[in-house]
Amino acid sequence: MQAAWLLGALVVPQLLGFGHGARGAEREWEGGWGGAQEEEREREALMLKHLQEALGLPAGRGDENPAGTVEGKEDWEMEEDQGEEEEEEATPTPSSGPSPSPTPEDIVTYILGRLAGLDAGLHQLHVRLHALDTRVVELTQGLRQLRNAAGDTRDAVQALQEAQGRAEREHGRLEGCLKGLRLGHKCFLLSRDFEAQAAAQARCTARGGSLAQPADRQQMEALTRYLRAALAPYNWPVWLGVHDRRAEGLYLFENGQRVSFFAWHRSPRPELGAQPSASPHPLSPDQPNGGTLENCVAQASDDGSWWDHDCQRRLYYVCEFPF
């Protein structure tokens, strides 16, 4: 019995060292060769069996899986999985508690970011403002050019109007001398339009003349013959350029000169031997008789006598043009 234990003490360490070497060789074999894995496991199991029989050891003692069998490997993997599960359980999961308050650095960073955004927006506004300023300058220059062009156009229109006025006056003067009465350095032309005295003067002026202003009795007699021939057999009063609007009884021509002679109408004188009438003839009173109500002078077309009338009365008129 002592010999058996002695043999076991000598053989078992060698077998165990062989088993560990076999397992190391197995690992090398699995890593490098992998061809005789099953054969090595069978040899190892057989040697352990013989050793147990020689020593009289029970089948359950010793290394339960000395050769690293598949069952031992599975147990080792299970233990590894359990260890990983324990590590996962031991790993603390992040809590869902309230987030920590921002630090001063975070606040400063946020403020700087907002300021950067505001600065970028302000830069865009400056760019747009510059574009608007450029547009305003362009529009101002265009408006100035338009004003200059409008001024030039206005000057051109005024020049055309002046030229048209001169042409109309020249046309009226030529028409007056061609169609009317030429007398010395004057031409008289009768107009059969009914106008007030001021309107008649304006129309004569627009045609380059004025209302008739007979300078002496010779011109007065020539004008009388012209009006009688133009309006016969009727008797029409015709406006002359004579009035006393400035002062009652002070008769002036339209050019401001004082009238040097008069041809006022006088009522018929009674025949010799007849009783003189105390009152003037009601249809032909002596002129002027209107006072301040009648300040303009018209000439009768039949005899050339002068009558004072209300200046607003609408009558024929005769224009005078220089020749």
From Swiss-Prot:
Domain called C-type lectin: residue spans: 183-320
**Intrachain S-S bonds:** C204-C319, C296-C311
Q: Point to the regions of Acidic residues compositional bias.
A: 74-90
**One cellular component term from this protein's GO annotations in UniProt:** cytoplasm
Position of sequence motif Cell attachment site: 61-63
* Lineage: superkingdom: Eukaryota
Where is it localised? Cytoplasm; Secreted
* Principal localisation: cytoplasm
Q: Which GO terms describe its biological process?
A: ossification; positive regulation of cell population proliferation
Which Pfam families does the UniProt record give?
Lectin_C
Q: Which residues form the signal peptide?
A: 1-21
Post-translational modification comment from the UniProt entry = O-glycosylated. Probably sulfated on the O-glycans.
Expression across tissues: Expressed in skeletal tissues including bone marrow, chondrocytes, primary ossification center-associated cells, the perichondrium and periosteum. Lower levels of expression were detected in spleen, thymus, appendix and fetal liver.
What UniProt keywords apply to this chain's record, in alphabetical order? Cytoplasm, Disulfide bond, Glycoprotein, Growth factor, Lectin, Osteogenesis, Secreted, Signal
Q: Does the keyword Transmembrane helix apply?
A: no
Q: What is this protein called?
A: C-type lectin domain family 11 member A
- Which source organism does the UniProt entry give? Homo sapiens
- Which gene is transcribed and translated to give this protein? CLEC11A
